[in-house]
Design a protein with these regions (language model features):
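N-terminal strand-loop-strand
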Residues: 1-34
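Acidic-residue sensor for enzyme active/binding pockets
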Residues: 23, 44, 57
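Short histidine-centered catalytic/ligand-binding loop motif
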Residues: 35-43
């Protein structure tokens, strides 16, 4: 059974609420947008994985992070269980590091 975490990362940007989305730069998902996330490392707890993904994507640690919802049985080629977390970060503290596989972008929440 595969388990992954997804972190819904919010910030206030130019006076409005924004969420971090990742544009996939490599196949097979090139051009698609996704929430930051990934699979657990062996022996890693859910909370530790969510904190790792938050820091990997934003450079931020020690912020509000809470488990939000768990999805299961998502279909072939996907994790069997996806645990979603909610984070609220200070935009001024973030350090985005795009690479050849993904490009982060803050998108307004309407």
């Amino acid at each position: 059974m595969a388990t992954s975490v997804v972190v819904v990362i919010f910030t206030v940007r130019q006076g409005s609420l924004s969420v971090l989305l990742i544009e996939r730069a490599a196949e097979p998902s090139q051009g698609q947008w996704a929430l930051p996330g990934g699979f657990l490392h062996e022996g890693e707890s859910l909370d530790a994985a969510a904190k790792r993904k938050l820091e990997d994507e934003t450079g931020v640690s020690d912020v509000f992070l809470e488990q939000l919802y768990t999805f299961d049985q998502l279909g072939e080629g996907r994790a069997d269980i996806v645990v979603t977390y909610f984070a609220l970060v200070d935009l001024a503290r973030t350090r985005m590091r795009p690479d050849s596989e993904w490009r982060p972008a803050w998108q307004p929440v309407h």
